[in-house]
């Protein structure tokens, strides 16, 4: 337990600790396919439909950094809808989003002891009011184009689109060490903490091509992350007031935080949001997914495949995405 009144951690200081534990935390609670947001201070850049692009290092830098260190980095560049050409893409691109509550307590905790500055330090992380948001996309190849003025377009051959986001409504990170006063960061706002991507090829003039598999792609897992330029990047969501961070001084410091009440039986177990953008991409109706959200990864049933050649909507991203999500949801059929 933290003793006394802890010193407040800044977001930059908390990021230094987050980078030490994020991969282990996210894999333990959300499964191996989820990618941890690289920095808490930039977490809003990794929300639903955010686009990530590869960024090459300068040639002399690549020669000096062999192997993993010389690999291309990923950088968030904004939400997909704001990057599309308005003329020609209207009607071709559509998506709907759905939000799920956990199948149990909407709170997770993690604790680890590490050597920091030569002293053992206990790291405690608590995340509360967890949610999962999923976007179902209709993105027919060859019919949707990116804006020609995007500075990174000429050197980009594929993009990553965030289609699944795990977020929390509050986060608390505490550090306890015998060599220093306890330190604490508590954020009282919605914050993405992990995400999953789809990869799409880019054809000439920024036209989006077909979806590409991620099975042999080393990215986005283990990527070197480039911090976004928040002054020029289109916002993904309204930014929270800075008071959200500084208000932590008025928040009682005990860890863990008050538990989130478990979800009640009844309508509260249903998805809390189901919205369409653009024309309805599911005119046939998708397969029915239950609202059970399991944090531990599960294997798909034997023989489960994506959209096949007999699927008339196989060109779109909606049905393959639904098939890909079958490993995390139980079917009601």
From Swiss-Prot:
Q: Name one GO cellular component term.
A: sperm flagellum
UniProt xrefs under InterPro entries: DUF4663
Q: Which domain of life is it from?
A: Eukaryota
Cysteines engaged in disulfide bonds, as pairs: none
Which residues lie in Polar residues bias regions? 324-333
Q: What compartments host this protein?
A: Cell projection, Cilium, Flagellum
Pfam families noted in UniProt: DUF4663 (PF15668)
Organism per entry? Homo sapiens
**Record key words, sorted:** Cell projection, Cilium, Flagellum
Provide the primary localization. other
Name of the protein: Uncharacterized protein C11orf42
Q: Where do the segments described as Disordered lie?
A: 234-333
């Amino acid at each position: 337990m933290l003793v006394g009144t802890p010193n407040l951690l800044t977001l930059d200081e908390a990021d230094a600790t987050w980078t030490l534990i994020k991969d282990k935390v996210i894999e333990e609670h959300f499964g191996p396919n989820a990618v941890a947001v690289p920095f808490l201070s930039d977490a809003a850049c990794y929300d639903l439909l955010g686009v990530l692009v590869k960024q090459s290092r300068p040639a002399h830098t690549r020669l000096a950094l062999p192997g993993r260190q010389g690999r291309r980095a990923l950088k968030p560049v904004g939400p997909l809808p704001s990057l599309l050409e308005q003329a020609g893409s209207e009607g071709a691109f559509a998506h709907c989003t759905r939000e799920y509550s956990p199948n149990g307590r909407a709170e997770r905790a993690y604790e680890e002891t590490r050597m920091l500055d030569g002293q053992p330090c206990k790291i405690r992380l608590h995340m509360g009011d967890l949610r999962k948001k999923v976007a179902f996309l209709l993105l027919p190849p060859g019919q949707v184009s990116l804006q020609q003025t995007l500075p990174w377009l000429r050197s980009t051959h594929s993009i990553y689109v965030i289609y699944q986001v795990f977020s929390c409504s509050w986060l608390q990170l505490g550090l306890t060490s015998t060599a220093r006063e306890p330190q604490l960061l508590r954020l009282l706002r919605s914050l993405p903490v992990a995400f999953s991507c789809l990869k799409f090829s880019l054809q000439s003039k920024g036209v989006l091509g077909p979806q590409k598999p991620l099975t042999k792609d080393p990215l986005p897992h283990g990527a070197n992350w480039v911090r976004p330029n928040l002054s020029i990047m289109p916002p993904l969501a309204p930014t929270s007031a800075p008071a959200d961070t500084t208000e932590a001084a008025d928040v009682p410091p005990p860890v863990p935080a008050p538990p989130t009440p478990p979800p009640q039986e009844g309508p509260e177990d249903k998805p809390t949001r189901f919205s369409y953008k653009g024309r309805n991409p599911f005119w046939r109706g998708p397969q029915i997914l239950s609202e059970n959200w399991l944090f531990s990864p599960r294997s798909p049933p034997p023989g489960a495949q994506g959209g096949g050649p007999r699927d008339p909507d196989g060109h779109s991203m909606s049905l393959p995405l639904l098939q890909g999500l079958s490993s995390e949801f139980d079917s009601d059929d």
